[in-house]
Every structure is written in C-alpha cells, then in structure tokens.
Design a protein with these regions (language model features):
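Flexible metal-binding regulatory segments at protein termini and peripheral loops
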Residues: 1-68
Length: 68
C-alpha cells in the first residue's frame, strides 16, 4: 500500500534526511519532500502507528496519513 505522510517540524534538508532515515530503518521505500512537509511511502506494509512512532522518535510530528 502507498501512503502519504504529512510531517510537522522539519525545517531543513538535515531534518528531512533524519525523517527519511527513521522510516528507511523500518524497511520503508520512502521519499521525503521538505518543501511539502511530506513523506511518500510506496508498497509499504507499515502500519500508521509504526510510522507515527518512528517519526515521533525522530523528533517530528505526523499530522496526517493518507492511504492510496
């Protein structure tokens, strides 16, 4: 399943990389777009809770997850 995750708190490219690395560590195929404050996960089996926890532990906040 594909997911679009809106992330609050990313301010720079280093922040985006940190969020990317947090999701990649869980095995996600992810692309993070700083200017959109979004992470795009493709063909993921991660639950919304797993995503939220990883982003929270990285120091950011998930404000929305859209399945699609």
């Amino acid at each position: 399943m594909n997911k679009i995750v809106t992330i609050e708190g990313m301010m720079c490219e280093k922040c985006a990389k940190h969020a990317h690395d947090a999701l990649s560590a869980l095995g996600a195929n992810v692309r993070v777009e700083l200017n959109e404050n979004k992470a795009y996960l493709t063909e993921t089996t991660l639950t919304d809770e797993q995503i939220k926890l990883a982003i929270d532990q990285a120091g950011y906040t998930v404000t929305q997850i859209v399945n699609g």
